[in-house]
Amino acid sequence: MGFQIAIDGPAASGKSTVARLLAEKLGFDHLNTGATYRAVAVYLHEKGLSPSSAEEEIENALKNLKIDYVNGRVYINGKDYTEKIQSPEAGVLASNFARLEVVRRHLVRIQREICDDKNIVVEGRDIGTVVLPNAHLKIFLTASLEARVERKLKEYQKRGLKVTKEEVERELISRDEQDSKRNVAPLKPAEDAVIIDTTSMSVEEVLDRILKLVRERMNT
């Protein structure tokens, strides 16, 4: 088995930036599981399905699903979904579908297959608790709601999306509520995770902290 690093945390806590840069510095593969959930949610929505659809219908839609995550782009059955999953609506769809056991079961299996025997940095909301419970290092990133709203607002503005600060705050509060209170794989730190509050930390400071932990684990 390769060296696996799990990075969990709520939306806009810094997971994606830190995970991507950490993987680059270490020469590891990188998997953004949130992107796979958003892509599958959009895929199911395009097929006319919703979280309230019959489980059998969703099961059939997912049965022969093939997901590839290559250089930060996510493909479903060979079709690039990367641009489609960037909107706030895709994030809401993902949170709603992620509550379903049938969706999580299929995606956890696929995510584990992607990670198998790799040196890899994996980011998400249930990596250390469900997807990779035996990861060599588990990190849980957190930050104040105010800091996360500012980060997400800048991200949307950079993409040219017109959203207000109030809309972003409502989105994050709603996603936090759904992620932490869902019955299946709720968002929470693994018991052996290192919790890092990134509110007042720069990306470089967070990376330095995690790299130090990686070196310690690799040398034990």
Curated annotation (Swiss-Prot):
Main subcellular localisation: cytoplasm
Xref: SUPFAM superfamilies: P-loop containing nucleoside triphosphate hydrolases
One annotated Gene Ontology cellular component of this protein: cytosol
Reaction equation(s) it catalyzes: CMP + ATP = CDP + ADP; dCMP + ATP = dCDP + ADP
Transmembrane annotation, as ranges: none
Gene Ontology molecular function: ATP binding; CMP kinase activity; dCMP kinase activity
Domain of life: Bacteria
Gene3D superfamilies: P-loop containing nucleotide triphosphate hydrolases (3.40.50.300)
Family, as annotated: Belongs to the cytidylate kinase family. Type 1 subfamily.
Protein name listed in UniProt: Cytidylate kinase
